[in-house]
Amino acid sequence: PIAGSMVLAAILLKLGGYGIIRMMQIMPTTKTDTFLPFLVLALWGAILANLTCLQQTDLKSLIAYSSISHMGLVVAAIIIQTPWGLSGAMALMIAHGFTSSALFCLANTTYERTHTRILILTRGFHNILPMATTWWLLTNLMNIATPPTMNFTSELLIMSTLFNWCPTTIILLGLSMLITASYSLHMFLSTQTGYPLLNNQTEPTHTREHLLMILHIVPLMMISMKPELVI
């Protein structure tokens, strides 16, 4: 059920990050080196989740693994225990909550018309549903963290935090962001470009689907313009 996936990615997954933030308040702040294995594990886990995304053929699995990679960055930022790190983690959790939920919503609109989640079978939608293609493009750009979205602000804060703590982490972060951009564009091109392989009749997009996407993207853009509401 797509509603379950949307709630899971947008809200329940963030409860783990909230729990870590609460636990860190009772931990010793000066001994970040104690948490070094967890920090390396979080960044390495983010890269492995990104690499797993690259070889997914199932659209829903791809979006689910992308959520895991973003949470790796959140955990790494929280472990550093600096104000910038916590702000970046909070911002990324909120931004990714909107983005991943929107991606699951779009995956469902595609599934309702094709009855398959295999990437190679869902191609060619830019000719059939051009407005849905616009939503796909906007959501994937948010997932890549292009400015002026909240995703960009949060990843910039996390990158600054980790770079100040240890400049070497920029290699892992850069690699993670490069792979994120790769699989996001791969997902967009696989589902929207080319010629449709399925020969069945496709329903047009409904107003409720456009409204759902507006309710995901507009609040995120408004928070991006006034980030002091959350960080």
From Swiss-Prot:
It is found in: Mitochondrion membrane. GO terms for cellular component: mitochondrial membrane. Keywords: Electron transport, Membrane, Mitochondrion, NAD, Respiratory chain, Translocase, Transmembrane, Transmembrane helix, Transport, Ubiquinone. It comes from Trimeresurus albolabris (White-lipped pit viper). PANTHER family: NADH-UBIQUINONE OXIDOREDUCTASE CHAIN 4 (PTHR43507:SF20). GO terms for molecular function: NADH dehydrogenase (ubiquinone) activity; ubiquinone binding. It comes from the Eukaryota. Its EC number is 7.1.1.2. Belongs to the complex I subunit 4 family. Core subunit of the mitochondrial membrane respiratory chain NADH dehydrogenase (Complex I) that is believed to belong to the minimal assembly required for catalysis. Complex I functions in the transfer of electrons from NADH to the respiratory chain. The immediate electron acceptor for the enzyme is believed to be ubiquinone. Signal peptide: none annotated. This is NADH-ubiquinone oxidoreductase chain 4.
